Each structure stands twice: as C-alpha cells, then as structure tokens.
C-alpha cells in the first residue's frame, strides 16, 4: 500500500478515533515498516490521532517502532542504502506477529502516565511468569544463538587468529582463563542430558533465605573454601583449554596453508574450517569475549561499508555515473584494481570525469583489498558472516530480554529485604537488575533447577556489593562489611540473652578474635556524620561550629598575646634606642629569629663583650618595679595555665 493511499485513508474521517481504530492504524503502520524496513515521520504523524499532542507519547511510539528494527527517517532512503544494509526481508506472517506483540505496549501510550517509575511497575506486572519448560525453551534459544555466533565468527580466519592469541596469553598467565572461556563442553555428556540419562548436580545451588543475617554469615564462612575451590577449578579449566585449543591451532595452520594454495571455496579448506567450527562449538566462551570478537568483526564490516559509500559518492555525485550501472558493475569488482582502467577504456560519457578521480577511487579500493588480505576471505563472504552474526545477536538479545522481563518481580522481592541500608530502593532495584542480567548470561538449564533459584544468588550478590561500595561515604572493603555485620549480629544476640551490651573483651571471646582487632573493627564501624548537620530547631548553628579547631588560637589567648605585645613595646620604648634594639635582636622580638652576641656586635660594629654589657644593663632596667610589675601579670596567667 502506498503512502498516498495511507494518507487518504487516515484522513477520511474527522471524528475521534476509537481504541480499535488506533490499534488498526498502528498495526498497519508496523506491518508496512517490517515489510519495507523503514517508516517516515510523516507516515507516523498520519497514523496518530489528531488530538495527540504530548511530545513524550509520540517519542515513545517512535522509540517502540525503532526497537522493532524499523528505521525511522525523515525521507525514504535511497535504493543503494537499502541494498548495502543487512536488513533482511520479513514475511507477512512475521510482520503481523511482531505488530500484534508491539501493540500491547503501544496501548499504554494513549492517555496514560509517562512517569518512568509508574511505567516500570505497570509494564513489569503485564509480563507473565515463566514455567520451567518456558525457561528451558528460552535458554535453548540463547544457547543456539551463541553457537551460531561462534560458528559465524569461526568462519573468519582473522577471528580464529584473535582467539588463538588470547589462548597464548592464557598460557603465559597474562590473563585469567575464565576471562575468555567459561567451560569446555563434553558432547557425550550433553547427549546424555538431552536423552534424560545424565545425572543432575549433586550439590544444589544455595537456596534463598528470608533471614539476611544468616545469608551474610553463610557467605562469610564459605568464602575461604570457595576461593580454594575456585583456584583449583581454574587450574583444571586452564589445562583443558590448552589441550583443546592445541588441536584447533593445528587445524588452523593446515587451513591457512590450504587457503594460500587454493581458495576459500576449496573442499579441503572447507573441511578444516568445519572441523575448527565443531571444536569451537564445544567451548563455552565468556559472554564478554563473544561481544569483543563480534565488535571486532562488526568494526571491519562498518569500515568496508564506509569505503563503499565514499566510492559510491564519488562515482554518482562527481563522476555522474548511472546508479544502476554502478551497482551492477562495481559491487562484483569491488577489490579489482583494474576496474577503473577498464571503465575509462570503454569511452563512456563519464570516462573523462572518472579519469580525474582515478587516484581517489584506487586509494579506497586498495584499502578494501588490504582488508580482504587481512581477513583472508572475500568482502562478500565477510559481509555474509557479519549478517549471520547480527541475526544471531538479535535472537540472543530478544531471548535474554524475555527472560529478564519475566523475572523483574524477583529483583523487587529481594531488594525489599535490603532497604534502609544506605541506598535508595530504586538504586537497589537497578543494581539487582544488573545481577539478573549476569544470571541470564551464565544460566545453565541442564543442571536441573529453575532460573529463579539460580538468579537469586546473583541478584543478592549484586545488591550487597553495591551497598558495600556506595552506601557509605568512606568505602569499607566487602569482607570488612561482612565482619561488621557479624559483630553487630552477635552483639544483638548477647543483648537479648543477657540484657547487657557486650564490651570489646566479651566480643573478642564470642567472635574468637583478638581484642585489639575488635577495637579496630568497632572504630571502623562508626558512621561518618556531616559537619553541616543542623543543631537545634534553627538552621543558624551546625555541628561544625561546636568542634574545637586545635590549629586556631583561642580568643582569650589571642587577647592576652595582643596585650603582651603592646606592653612589651611600651616598656622597650622606655629604654634607650640602642638598648631596645639589642634586646629585640637578642630575643627575636618583632623579628624572624633571635641573634647571637657576635651577630648583634657586627650590626653595631662593636665587640661581643660590649653587646653583653649593654644587654645586662638593659635587663637590670627591666627588673625595676616600675617596669617589671606591668609584665608580672602575664607571667602569673601563664603559671595558672600550667
């Protein structure tokens, strides 16, 4: 259906639209967008009711359409943009299903609140809980999508080389093995599990408890044992990984040798490539590592498209080559450096203009050819690999999103137990959601337990870690937080049993720790308080105003020192100028430092003995009652302080 037909249909009636008519318009718009791959803003405006003027609601609908993989543009894109893109065609049935799924969220945009918290709670409640069978189906979707991504990545020799470089770093202990590989999967064990012949794990995951104090205690007691088990498991995993990738490296060298002798379609090359792919499928890579490899491959394809667009712009906008002719003749010869010479030799209308831009086009073609040599496969094969990888990424992301949305209520139920610990409730939910996403990445449905049982540990760990890292102004390590919690729990228990607060000695006995360490823990456990805390009902005074500053002089002392300075100055002025200056220099009065007899003698050009005589005479004058009585009061005040 054309745009004009849509516009005429939307403008048939000036009456207010019913909910069903609004749904029908949005359904038709989404179906058209899925079939074409794009929707223009004018088509969205035509589909919306005339009385909708809220910009937030319109933006939410545009975001919903974009989230379905439909490109929202100002104008219809060019044919070559559609051709160079990876958007696959969608069948009518698929478009209708996605439109119906999207309409359930679009209904909430007509006349409802746009408050993010209310929207979050409301939309969370609309998602149905998953059964064990539903969780297995979603987990298999994620697993198959990851396998397809690994298979797509393994089809690129450059990506295999990157993986082997990482394995070499593992051998040299430059990186941890679990940063790259989580496990080596035994295909026979997988088959037994699929047939129901395998045995479930003997140790079930930790079950959630309603008592948070017990959870913290159990976590603390098992921390050292868990570290020892983890170290042993990592050492065992490292040996498995090194042995597994040794065979992959041998096949890779044979595959590269075959590629150099023949081509990427040769049967021997394909056999080695499939053997490597099968070996890589037995490896469960870390999600972050798969994302890194995918990003590397995606970056190469984006660079290829950028160079293609630059060549297209030169040929179409500057050389004025016909668009259909360019698409038909250039794309198959994209890395053929003789293509431009052959086109110039044909003597077409644009041949002279093409000759002027010969070097610019050759430079970009050379970059494409170098990239082809680097990846060891053709540009078209690299694009096809990227297309398969992007398709698998979308499937994996959609399945993970479904699993996450169905378990958001679990996060809230756990976060409620950790309120009043220094973080806002919404922050706790956010941190719990991060733990939920990690649980989705690491969930293994073959172990036999439900996802919620497994995710509880990840959610609780994410929340407790965030409280330890962010709740206090001065950060305390997580293990010390656990020790403080244990000490507080024992202290409360002792208070309930005896009615008395335990002292440091009693806590040391109960916790079986040295008393000096208990004192340090009690000192660390004190919460900081702001110096701007108001004191009293008025806001005029703060806590900082009542804290003594040892670096400042007390007002009484400052007044005494000022008075002493004035009296000393008056008494010295009663002496002769020479005697006053000698005393000032000898005792450092109004000077940076005192001076020796030798230094004062050089100042007056006399001997040190003469200076000593002048000093003794001046001090005798100061001892006269008319002068000494004025200074005696300051001496008495100093003695009273001592």
Swiss-Prot record:
Residues 571-624 are annotated as: Sigma-70 factor domain-4. A motif (Interaction with polymerase core subunit RpoC) lies at residues 427-430. Residues 199-228 are annotated as: Disordered. Keywords: Cytoplasm, DNA-binding, Sigma factor, Transcription, Transcription regulation. It is found in: Cytoplasm. Interacts transiently with the RNA polymerase catalytic core. This is RNA polymerase sigma factor RpoD. It comes from Neisseria gonorrhoeae.
């Amino acid at each position: 259906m054309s745009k004009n037909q849509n516009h005429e249909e939307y403008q048939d009636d000036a009456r207010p639209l019913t909910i069903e008519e609004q749904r029908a318009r949005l359904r038709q718009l989404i179906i058209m967008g899925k079939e074409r791959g794009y929707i223009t803003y004018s088509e969205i405006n035509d589909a919306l009711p005339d009385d909708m003027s809220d910009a937030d609601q319109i933006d939410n609908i545009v975001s919903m359409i974009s989230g379905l993989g439909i490109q929202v543009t100002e104008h219809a894109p060019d044919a070559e943009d559609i051709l160079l893109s990876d958007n696959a065609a969608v069948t009518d049935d698929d478009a209708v299903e996605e439109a119906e799924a999207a309409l359930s969220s679009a209904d909430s945009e007509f006349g409802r609140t746009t408050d993010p918290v209310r929207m979050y709670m409301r939309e969370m409640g609309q998602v149905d809980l998953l059964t064990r069978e539903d969780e297995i189906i979603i987990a298999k979707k994620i697993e198959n999508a990851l396998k397809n991504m690994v298979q797509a990545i393994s089809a690129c020799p450059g990506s295999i080389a990157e993986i082997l470089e990482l394995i070499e770093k593992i051998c040299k202990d430059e990186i941890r093995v679990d940063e790259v590989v989580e496990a080596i999967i035994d295909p026979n064990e997988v088959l037994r599990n699929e047939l129901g012949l395998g045995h479930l794990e003997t140790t079930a995951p930790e079950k959630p408890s309603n008592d948070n104090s017990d959870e913290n205690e159990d976590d603390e007691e098992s921390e050292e044992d868990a570290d020892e088990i983890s170290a042993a498991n990592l050492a065992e995993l490292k040996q498995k990984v090194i042995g597994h990738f040794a065979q992959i490296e041998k096949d890779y060298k044979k595959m590269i040798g075959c590629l150099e002798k023949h081509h990427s379609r040769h049967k021997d090359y394909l056999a080695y490539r499939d053997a490597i792919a099968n070996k890589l499928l037995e490896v469960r890579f870390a999600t972050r590592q798969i994302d890194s490899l995918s990003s590397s491959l995606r970056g190469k394809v984006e660079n290829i498209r950028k160079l293609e667009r630059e060549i297209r712009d030169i040929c179409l906008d500057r050389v004025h080559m016909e668009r259909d002719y360019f698409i038909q003749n250039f794309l198959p010869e994209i890395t053929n450096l003789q293509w431009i010479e052959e086109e110039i030799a044909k003597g077409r209308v644009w041949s002279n203009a093409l000759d002027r831009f010969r070097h610019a086009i050759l430079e970009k073609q050379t970059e494409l050819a170098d990239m082809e040599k680097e990846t060891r496969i053709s540009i078209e094969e690299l694009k096809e690999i990227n297309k398969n990888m992007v398709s698998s990424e979308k499937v994996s992301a959609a399945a993970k999103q479904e699993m996450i949305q169905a378990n958001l209520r679990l996060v809230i139920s756990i976060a409620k137990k950790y309120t009043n610990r220094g973080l806002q409730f919404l922050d706790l939910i956010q941190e719990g959601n991060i733990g939920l996403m990690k649980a989705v990445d690491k969930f293994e449905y073959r172990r036999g337990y439900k996802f919620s049982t497994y995710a509880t540990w990840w959610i609780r760990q994410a929340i407790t870690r965030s409280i330890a890292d962010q709740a206090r102004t001065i950060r305390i390590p997580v293990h010390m937080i656990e020790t403080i919690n244990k000490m507080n729990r024992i202290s409360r228990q002792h208070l309930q049993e005896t009615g008395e607060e335990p002292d440091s000695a009693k806590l040391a006995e109960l916790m079986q720790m040295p008393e000096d360490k208990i004192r340090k823990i009690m000192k660390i456990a004190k919460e900081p308080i702001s110096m701007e805390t108001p004191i009293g009902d008025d806001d005029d005074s703060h806590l900082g105003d009542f804290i003594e500053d040892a670096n400042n002089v007390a007002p009484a002392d400052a007044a005494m020192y000022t008075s002493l300075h004035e009296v000393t100055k008056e008494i010295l002025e009663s002496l002769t100028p020479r005697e006053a200056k000698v005393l000032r220099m000898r005792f450092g009065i109004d000077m940076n430092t005192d001076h020796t007899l030798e230094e004062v003698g050089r100042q007056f050009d006399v001997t040190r003995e003469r200076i000593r005589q002048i000093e003794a005479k001046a001090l005798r004058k100061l001892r006269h009652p008319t002068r000494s009585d004025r200074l005696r009061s300051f001496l008495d005040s100093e003695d009273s302080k001592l």
